């Protein structure tokens, strides 16, 4: 999936990108390719990775920025959080994004439907229901599908079929 497609289609300008839980920065090159000239801010919980790659240390639960970002990426982070921290993180993502959000998180239903290859997946995660994620994100976002959410701050007019539940 071209994660940048929805924002380009909806004409959401992308100048600042936040990758929260960035790890080794796999998204940095993708962001540079899809959004030339946009600044990339990596935030990571691991002090080692921050020192090695120059990221800012922080957590999706309580990371604060001076102003919201146009694109926020949160891949593979939320399942490691307990339920209370997930709720706080989802609320915080709403504060951090004024444009779009890409979220990737395994859910309990993925395990129940045997979609997860447990030999290749870290099983030291909480198996939150997908509805927990959706309910928390709906507060600040409209679901576009494919893990992409549009901030309610974006004030982008959309036709009913352009978003989930429209």
Q: What does each of the following model-derived ranges do?
A:
Residues 1-67, 81-88, 92-94, 99-166:
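Class I (Rossmann-like) S-adenosyl-L-methionine-dependent methyltransferase catalytic domain
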Residues 73:
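A conserved beta-strand element that flanks and buttresses the S-adenosyl-L-methionine
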Residues 76-80:
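Short catalytic micro-motifs in class I SAM-dependent methyltransferases
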């Amino acid at each position: 999936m071209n994660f940048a497609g929805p924002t380009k289609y909806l004409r959401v300008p992308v100048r600042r990108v936040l990758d929260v839980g960035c790890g080794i920065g796999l998204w940095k090159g993708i962001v540079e390719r899809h959004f030339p000239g946009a600044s990339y801010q990596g935030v990571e919980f691991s002090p080692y990775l921050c020192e090695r790659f120059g990221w800012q240390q922080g957590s999706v639960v309580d990371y604060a920025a001076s102003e919201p970002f146009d694109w926020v990426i949160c891949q593979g982070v939320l399942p490691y959080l307990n339920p209370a921290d997930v709720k706080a993180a989802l609320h915080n993502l709403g504060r951090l994004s004024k444009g779009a959000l890409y979220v990737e998180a395994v859910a309990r239903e993925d395990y129940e439907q045997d979609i997860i290859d447990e030999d290749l997946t870290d099983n030291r995660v909480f198996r939150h229901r997908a509805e927990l994620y959706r309910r928390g994100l709906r507060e600040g976002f409209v679901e576009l599908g494919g893990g992409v959410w549009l901030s309610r701050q974006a004030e982008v007019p959309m036709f009913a079929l352009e978003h989930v539940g429209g």
